[in-house]
């Protein structure tokens, strides 16, 4: 069941009530916005750059190259990674608990830190209290694993999940019971809210419905729009398109959701002012930091960067931090989506290093590209379930 309630500033005004079978009562449908936040964490936080890369590959079933795995295990890291856009998070209320979650259009699970973890594992995190309001889904379980060896698993509960001002009751919540230290050490992140298609939800024995699929029929339009920012929190707009957030008009392209992802085909690409390259098939994924492309495209890009090289020990392409990087342009229909070179200068390989890790890396031959945050944070992107389709425009 979905219930709309009155909330604050960034929320469009609305009110609706639906039945237990998630069939809406005839009342006005509206939309709402939620702002990302940058959670303050006490002490120094580090991020393993090759681990970020390895996780992105493993998420889509790619074989993680031995050197990337070795670099991830060795722990090459930077400090204060939020400055380099590793992740911005969105407050979500689950039952009586409010957690900061990573919204991920590349997965379909809502999993969170919970009171089923040990007190040491909960420390520094906001956690979901499974005893406060949730109802355990008997016999259901979930498990995830990533390329750097991290993972989590646990039980499944049904509870009320509130994003902005929309409440989805009876929503599946995957409560962590076991979790790796990599997640425990990331004190800013309390879990993940998947926005891919429900067909790839990993709950066993029966996949569950995503938050968006639960509420979309009660929105003014069955869509959400993403405005990620470079070096700043962004917003997610549910049910409406905010014309103040983009310039020009939206260009739409069809989505192939047969594999459960927001997959699309870009007509061509260009490095700097160079000639156009061939089409690129890929997935729009807010849960992946990097822009992962075919080897030929990656090579084309870094040929234009002085001092760039595929560094075996670093686990990917690196270049001098003072290098000038060309823009990377993807053409979608009549629209040229430009990724500024400064966005591709991702982060120092280690704290104080003069070498930087590139935001464009190889997709390790998986057969499609991943348009992660490096690409998305210069675009206004509409994820429209009606079609389905994606709409693109330059951010205002």
Swiss-Prot record:
Disulfide bonds, paired cysteine numbers: 321-356
A GO-annotated cellular component: extracellular region
Top-level enzyme category: hydrolase
Keyword annotations: Aspartyl protease, Disulfide bond, Glycoprotein, Hydrolase, Protease, Secreted, Signal, Zymogen
InterPro entries tied to this protein: Aspartic_peptidase_A1 (IPR001461), Aspartic_peptidase_AS (IPR001969), Aspergillopepsin-like_cat_dom (IPR034163), PEPTIDASE_A1 (IPR033121), Peptidase_aspartic_dom_sf (IPR021109)
EC number: 3.4.23.20
Pfam family, one: Asp
An individual GO BP term: proteolysis
Positions of the propeptide removed during maturation: 21-72
Glycosylation sites: 311
Subcellular location: Secreted
Reactions it catalyzes: Hydrolysis of proteins with broad specificity similar to that of pepsin A, preferring hydrophobic residues at P1 and P1', but also cleaving 20-Gly-|-Glu-21 in the B chain of insulin. Clots milk, and activates trypsinogen
Residues that span the membrane, as ranges: none
Signal peptide span: 1-20
Domain of life: Eukaryota
Domain Peptidase A1, first and last residues per copy: 88-393
Catalytic residues (positions): 104, 285
GO MF term set: aspartic-type endopeptidase activity
Family of this protein: Belongs to the peptidase A1 family.
Function according to Swiss-Prot or TrEMBL: Secreted aspartic endopeptidase that allows assimilation of proteinaceous substrates. The scissile peptide bond is attacked by a nucleophilic water molecule activated by two aspartic residues in the active site. Shows a broad primary substrate specificity. Favors hydrophobic residues at the P1 and P1' positions, but can also activate trypsinogen and hydrolyze the B chain of insulin between positions 'Gly-20' and 'Glu-21'.
Assembly and interaction partners: Monomer.
Protein's UniProt name: Penicillopepsin-1
Gene this protein is translated from: pepA
């Amino acid at each position: 069941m979905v219930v709309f309630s009155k909330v604050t500033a960034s929320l469009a005004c609305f009110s609706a009530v639906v039945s237990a079978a998630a069939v809406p009562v005839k009342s006005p449908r509206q939309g709402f916005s939620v702002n990302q936040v940058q959670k303050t964490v006490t002490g120094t936080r580090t991020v393993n750059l090759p681990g970020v890369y390895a996780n992105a590959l493993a998420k889509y079933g790619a074989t993680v190259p031995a050197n990337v795995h070795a670099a991830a295990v060795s722990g090459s890291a930077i400090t204060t990674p939020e400055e380099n856009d590793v992740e911005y998070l969105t407050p979500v209320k689950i039952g009586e608990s409010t957690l900061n979650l990573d919204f991920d259009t590349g997965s379909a699970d809502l999993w969170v830190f919970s009171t089923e973890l040990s007190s040491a594992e909960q420390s520094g995190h906001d956690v979901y209290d499974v005893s406060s309001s949730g109802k355990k889904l008997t016999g259901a379980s979930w498990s995830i694993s990533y390329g750097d060896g991290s993972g989590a698993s646990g039980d499944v509960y049904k509870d009320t999940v509130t994003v902005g001002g929309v409440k989805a009751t009876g929503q599946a919540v995957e409560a962590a019971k076991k979790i790796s230290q990599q997640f425990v050490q990331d004190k800013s992140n309390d879990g993940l809210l998947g926005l891919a298609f429900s067909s790839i939800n990993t709950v066993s024995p029966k996949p569950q419905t995503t938050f968006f699929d639960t509420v979309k029929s009660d929105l003014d339009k069955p869509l959400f729009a993403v405005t990620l920012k470079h070096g700043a929190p962004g917003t997610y707009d549910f049910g409406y398109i905010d014309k103040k957030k983009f310039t020009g008009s939206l260009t739409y392209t069809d989505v192939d959701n047969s594999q459960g992802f927001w997959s699309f085909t870009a007509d061509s690409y260009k490095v700097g002012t160079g000639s156009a390259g061939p089409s690129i098939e890929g997935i729009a994924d807010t849960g992946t930091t990097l822009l992962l492309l075919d080897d030929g495209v990656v090579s084309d890009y870094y040929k234009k960067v002085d001092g760039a090289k595929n560094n075996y020990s670093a686990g990917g392409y690196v270049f001098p931090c003072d290098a000038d990087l060309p823009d990377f342009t993807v053409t979608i229909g009549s629209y040229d989506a430009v990724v500024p070179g400064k966005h591709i200068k991702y982060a120092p390989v280690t704290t104080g290093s003069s070498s930087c890790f590139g935001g464009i890396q190889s997709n390790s031959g998986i057969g499609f590209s991943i348009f992660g945050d490096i690409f998305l944070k210069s675009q206004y992107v509409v994820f429209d379930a009606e079609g389905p389709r994606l709409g693109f425009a330059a951010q205002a």
